[in-house]
């Protein structure tokens, strides 16, 4: 995903990727991770996702990162929150209650920031990246998370030649290859969702599935 494409999408209101409800797969599978209340959860490329508010409502501390200032501002405004704002070398931090969102580049984060995260929730980051950026994302960013960190990864699967991403198709074989050997990856569920996504059908897709994986960071 090019920075300019993402920023322009928010500026022009082309945010059809934003879900107007909490992701059902998050609600279904997050409790199975059995993470203690108060754990810090890392959410990359947040947009203004309602999933952050849901995680916070479960008692978790949310640490998100988002490139678009508009997305960050809209998230807090739409939840009636007035965040405290501070600057760091990571970007601009917006914090209200138990939610902190850094407006900055996801690839600028490091282990010093992420070493106390017990969980990871990726619904939008991996599928937003073209193939050439997925391995750096996993090798350079995901390895900053500590051993024992667990979470969920949600992907889309379709015939890539039928549509220009983002979002991109990321098949199970690629997930397993990219996350190995530093992560234990388990497929939890895969569903055909094209009937519920007419917008993707209109873009030419003949098949569309979503898959959810459980991730566990290994001491490697």
UniProtKB/Swiss-Prot annotation:
Record-annotated membrane-spanning stretches: none
E.C. number(s) listed in UniProt: 2.1.1.67
Record's GO cellular component terms: cytoplasm
Keyword hit for Transferase: yes
Binding site for S-adenosyl-L-methionine: 10, 45, 66, 123
Keywords: Cytoplasm, Methyltransferase, S-adenosyl-L-methionine, Transferase
Cell compartment(s), UniProt: Cytoplasm
Record-level Gene Ontology MF annotations: thiopurine S-methyltransferase activity
Reaction(s) catalysed by this chain's protein: S-adenosyl-L-methionine + a thiopurine = S-adenosyl-L-homocysteine + a thiopurine S-methylether
Gene Ontology biological-process entries: methylation; response to metal ion
Classification via InterPro entries: SAM-dependent_MTases_sf (IPR029063), Thiopur_S-MeTfrase_Se/Te_detox (IPR022474), Thiopurine_S-MeTrfase (IPR025835), TPMT (IPR008854)
Keyword Cytoplasm found: yes
NCBIfam families named in the record: PRK13255.1 (NF009732), TMPT_Se_Te (TIGR03840)
Family: Belongs to the class I-like SAM-binding methyltransferase superfamily. TPMT family.
Name of protein: Thiopurine S-methyltransferase
Origin species: Nitrosomonas eutropha (strain DSM 101675 / C91 / Nm57)
Encoding gene per record: tpm
């Amino acid at each position: 995903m090019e920075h300019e494409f993402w920023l322009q999408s928010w500026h022009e209101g082309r945010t059809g990727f934003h879900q107007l409800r909490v992701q059902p797969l998050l609600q279904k599978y997050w409790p199975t991770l059995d993470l203690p209340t108060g754990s810090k959860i890392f959410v990359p490329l947040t947009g203004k996702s309602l999933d952050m508010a849901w995680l916070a409502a479960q008692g978790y501390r949310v640490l998100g990162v988002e490139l678009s200032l508009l997305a960050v501002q809209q998230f807090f405004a739409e939840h009636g929150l007035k965040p405290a704002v501070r600057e760091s070398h990571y970007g601009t931090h917006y914090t209200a209650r138990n939610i902190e969102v850094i407006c900055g580049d996801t690839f600028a984060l490091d282990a010093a920031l992420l070493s106390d995260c017990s969980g990871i929730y990726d619904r939008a980051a991996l599928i937003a990246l073209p193939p050439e950026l997925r391995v750096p994302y996993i090798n350079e960013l995901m390895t900053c998370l500590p051993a024992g960190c667990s979470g969920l990864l949600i992907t889309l699967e379709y015939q890539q030649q039928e549509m220009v991403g983002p979002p991109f198709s990321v098949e199970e074989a690629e997930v397993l290859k990219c996350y190995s050997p530093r992560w234990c990856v388990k497929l939890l569920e895969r569903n055909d969702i094209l009937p519920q996504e007419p917008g993707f059908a209109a873009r030419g897709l003949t098949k569309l599935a979503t898959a959810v994986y459980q991730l566990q960071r290994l001491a490697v």
